């Protein structure tokens, strides 16, 4: 069984995330959407909200499982018997950052990182941008799924 973990804070879930997830579904038997938790990090949305965003968006997709985890992503992958870490790349900066992490993860665990390029109309979307636009009262609706818009 080909199983991948797509880790993130999903604060909030964006159409950039769903673009990567939806395009990865045919590649894997199961994709675990893994919300990493860090008690020293401030989040805009509660863990419960972020779980709801993911579960509601993928409630009809049998290949998707939603979990939370603490600690190293590779340790979580091992606990789930996942052989791959799925990551999205928006630009060259993402590539350099993710390449370094991916190589380190592989050295530590033998777990490969699989990178998908963002679709051309989604490369500008990030949770950071969405949070900033929301904070300043701007229109963010074109960057997030319906479940986030309703929150």
Swiss-Prot record:
Keywords, alphabetical: ATP-binding, Coenzyme A biosynthesis, Cytoplasm, Magnesium, Nucleotide-binding, Nucleotidyltransferase, Transferase
Any GO BP annotation: coenzyme A biosynthetic process
Location relative to the cell: Cytoplasm
InterPro entries: Cyt_trans-like, PPAT, Rossmann-like_a/b/a_fold
Enzyme class: transferase
Site residues (Transition state stabilizer), renumbered to this chain: 17
GO cellular component, one term: cytoplasm
Binding site for substrate: 9, 41, 73, 87
Pathway assignment: Cofactor biosynthesis; coenzyme A biosynthesis; CoA from (R)-pantothenate: step 4/5
Listed cofactors: Mg(2+)
Gene3D superfamilies registered for this protein in UniProt: HUPs
Residues annotated to bind ATP: 9-10, 17, 88-90, 98, 122-128
GO molecular function: ATP binding; pantetheine-phosphate adenylyltransferase activity
Superkingdom as given in the UniProt entry: Bacteria
Catalytic activity field: (R)-4'-phosphopantetheine + ATP + H(+) = 3'-dephospho-CoA + diphosphate
Enzyme Commission number(s) of this protein: 2.7.7.3
Reported function: Reversibly transfers an adenylyl group from ATP to 4'-phosphopantetheine, yielding dephospho-CoA (dPCoA) and pyrophosphate.
Family named by the database record: Belongs to the bacterial CoaD family.
Complex and partners: Homohexamer.
Protein's name in the database: Phosphopantetheine adenylyltransferase
Annotated source species: Christiangramia forsetii (strain DSM 17595 / CGMCC 1.15422 / KT0803)
Native organism taxonomy: Bacteria, Pseudomonadati, Bacteroidota, Flavobacteriia, Flavobacteriales
Gene (name only): coaD
């Amino acid at each position: 069984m080909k199983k991948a973990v797509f880790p993130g804070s999903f604060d909030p879930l964006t159409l950039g995330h769903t673009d990567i997830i939806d395009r990865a579904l045919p590649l894997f038997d199961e994709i675990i959407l893994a919300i990493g938790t860090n008690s020293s990090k401030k989040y805009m949305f509660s863990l419960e909200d972020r779980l709801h965003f993911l579960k509601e968006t993928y409630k009809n997709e049998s290949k998707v499982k939603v979990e939370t985890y603490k600690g190293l992503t590779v340790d979580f992958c091992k606990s789930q018997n996942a052989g791959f870490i799925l990551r999205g790349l928006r630009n060259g900066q993402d590539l350099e950052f993710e390449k370094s992490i991916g190589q380190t993860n592989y050295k530590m665990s033998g777990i490969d990182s699989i990178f998908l390029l963002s679709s051309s109309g989604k490369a500008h979307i990030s949770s950071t941008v969405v949070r900033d636009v929301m904070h300043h009262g701007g229109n963010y609706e074109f960057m997030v799924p319906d479940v986030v818009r309703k929150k």
